[in-house]
Regions:
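Active-site cores that bind ATP or allylic diphosphates and position pyrophosphate for catalysis
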Residues: 1-276
Length: 276
């Protein structure tokens, strides 16, 4: 049923799967469950559990408040989506998100806002488009970008050459078949120069913070683990490629802060030890 829905080429995978469920189970609420993006993601998690850890039992927890991507919670429960929080932050700063975040972390948000330690999305969009334009040299400049298929490299190049804003770029790329979220990831991968040489799975564990008494839990992990990226870089070729990609993304993010920061912040970041 799913193959039949995908064959017409007029819908994305999530919509095709929902239509297939409706065709197989008409008159049931199953298809309606797949209206929610997070429920589609849950299906993928359950498939992975069946394949990798069939003894594990997933426990579904209904989402309260706003759904994924909704502006604000439609009911009295004060839970906002991440998209809504970002928009509130951009228009009103830390105080605007105060009703929707834990009271204990609000001082940290206020401190970050005062210091300009947050993304300026206008700057980020222009920086991304500038990087993409700089890569428009030679034939099929985006052919090697990670995740490119079905001629998307040509569509991306045309969109980059014609667009003057990041929103225009995403509008030009997005179709029923190519959802905006996927095109946003594709454009960023292209801007940062990510190709299929990047490991498909994480080759290391970058330790950002922990409780000291819990560090012993890491002794049996199968991957290299460290808080120091340069130490991880020396582990093997896969780690070196991933560290380079991580630093590229970190430096891009630092430049696109409200108050831009210099390169190399990820190399200077010290591990955070939790005390509570």
């Amino acid at each position: 049923a799913l193959k039949a829905q995908l064959a017409d080429g007029a819908r994305n995978f999530a919509a095709a799967r929902q239509a297939a469920v409706e065709a197989l189970c008409p008159g049931t609420p199953l298809a309606a469950l797949l209206d929610k993006p997070n429920n589609n993601l849950a299906v993928e998690y359950c498939k992975a559990i069946l394949e990798l850890a069939p003894a594990m039992t997933p426990v579904p927890l209904p989402r309260q408040g706003a759904d994924h991507g909704q502006e604000l919670a439609p009911d009295a429960v004060r839970f906002a989506s991440a998209s809504a929080l970002r928009k509130l932050w951009q228009t009103g700063g830390a105080d605007a998100v105060a009703p929707y975040v834990p009271e204990a972390v609000l001082p940290f948000y206020r401190e970050a806002f005062a210091a300009g330690q947050y993304t300026d999305f206008d700057a980020a969009g222009r920086c991304e488009l500038a990087l993409l334009r700089s890569r428009c040299v030679g034939q099929t400049p985006f052919a090697a970008v990670r995740g490119v298929s079905e001629g998307l490299e040509h569509r991306l190049e045309r969109a980059v050459r014609a667009s003057t804003t990041h929103e225009e770029l995403l509008d030009a790329l997005t179709t029923v078949r190519y959802p905006r979220a996927r095109m946003r990831r594709l454009a960023m991968d292209a801007a940062l120069g990510y190709d299929d040489a990047l490991p498909a799975l994480p080759p290391y564990l970058h330790l950002l913070g922990a409780r000291r008494e819990a560090l012993s839990l890491l002794k049996d992990v199968n991957l290299p683990v460290s808080h120091a990226l340069m130490r991880l870089k020396d582990e093997n070729d896969a780690c070196a490629r991933m560290v380079s990609a991580q630093l590229t993304a970190s430096d891009f993010s630092a430049l696109c802060r409200k108050i831009p920061e210099p390169m190399g912040s990820a190399l200077r970041q010290k591990i955070i030890f939790l005390t509570k």
